[in-house]
Amino acid sequence: NITLYTYAELESLDGFIGNLKARIRRKSKGIDEKLCTGCGLCTTKCPVKKIPGEFDERMGNRSAIYVPFPQAVPNKPVIDRKNCTYYIKGKCRICEKVCPTQAIRFDQEDQITETEVGAIVVATGFTVKQTDFFPEYGYGKYPDVITGLQFERLASASGPTFGEIRR
């Protein structure tokens, strides 16, 4: 059996292959995944919409409650506590008001899970090479000099320009 922990970090790992004890921090998403249907109403009604999206290499915007990337598993939103008006000022809660299943959980905290496992697959993603190491290409100086990853996001049908290359 495979258990998938998304939006989580491995805190510690003890034991040996085949007999491991894992301590996993499951970061708060601010939603109840069992109640959320992934309808997207909360993301469309959120008034905070000008946050540069990490997945689109900051070339497109997202709201304070958002699905981290297309085809996310599970395809459900997370609340960005650093940009959410409720967490900053104690006001708003529009996402909570419009949610048809009452899945928003502003009081949700990180959870620590300890489990015994035989093996672990860690999918950490990647780190993009910093462009300031190559000043001769003019990245940051000329607006039309972009990284390969930025070009990939622009060319993608799910990207900030819906696949239309325009600069």
Label the predicted regions:
Residues 37-40, 163-167:
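Rossmann-like NAD(P)H-binding beta-loop-alpha module
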